[in-house]
């Protein structure tokens, strides 16, 4: 007789658990829009770091580069090589886009481990890396989608949509679905890896002394850089694919 009440209580408990959010959020009301303030604040910090670093490095350019200028020239060469490898000979106009994606994601990922976000007190929630929030990663993935649609349409015009019936019209639904899964895979891969890395570090710090999680933090820095590289590489590959001829 007690089976039904127990089952109801169990289901109620599972329902309550399903409503629990991962962390709390601080929102701003700007006009009629509700803005996620934590992501906005940390994104501004990351952008300020990037702009400040570049300004300091190139404010007095030298014929023979040194220090910061040398580093950023090497970084530019790396991004150009990456873009050329994935896009092809028409890579030039896309270097700024790929470079912006790579640098923003890279600095955002590292900021989660290197910047003391926790010391900044908020009315609700706490600050974390911008890429620790699904809103940021989805926005970056959607920008990538817009970029490769623009690349394909600007290169081929309306004939770009002919790829959806290649090599046979039977594959039309699958080819359309593929364009929707690209931004989903980009966003969830980046979000999942960064969130998991920060959660592992937080759990280890709460369970064991500070020295023990340090190797995990270094591993997190390495994987954060790899995730930025993967995102930029796939973005360039999608753009290059949209500009290729049908096979």
UniProtKB/Swiss-Prot annotation:
GO molecular function, one term: proton-transporting ATP synthase activity, rotational mechanism
Main localization category: plastid
Gene: atpI
Protein name as catalogued: ATP synthase subunit a, chloroplastic
Bilayer topology term: Multi-pass membrane protein
Job description of the protein: Key component of the proton channel; it plays a direct role in the translocation of protons across the membrane.
Keyword Secreted in annotation: no
Record's subunit section: F-type ATPases have 2 components, CF(1) - the catalytic core - and CF(0) - the membrane proton channel. CF(1) has five subunits: alpha(3), beta(3), gamma(1), delta(1), epsilon(1). CF(0) has four main subunits: a, b, b' and c.
Keywords (A to Z) from UniProt: ATP synthesis, CF(0), Chloroplast, Hydrogen ion transport, Ion transport, Membrane, Plastid, Thylakoid, Transmembrane, Transmembrane helix, Transport
CDD domains, A to Z: ATP-synt_Fo_a_6
Transmembrane segments: 38-58, 95-115, 134-154, 199-219, 220-240
GO annotations of cellular component type: chloroplast thylakoid membrane; plasma membrane; proton-transporting ATP synthase complex
Family membership: Belongs to the ATPase A chain family.
Record localization: Plastid, Chloroplast thylakoid membrane
SUPFAM superfamilies associated with the record: F1F0 ATP synthase subunit A
Superkingdom, natural source: Eukaryota
Originating organism: Lemna minor (Common duckweed)
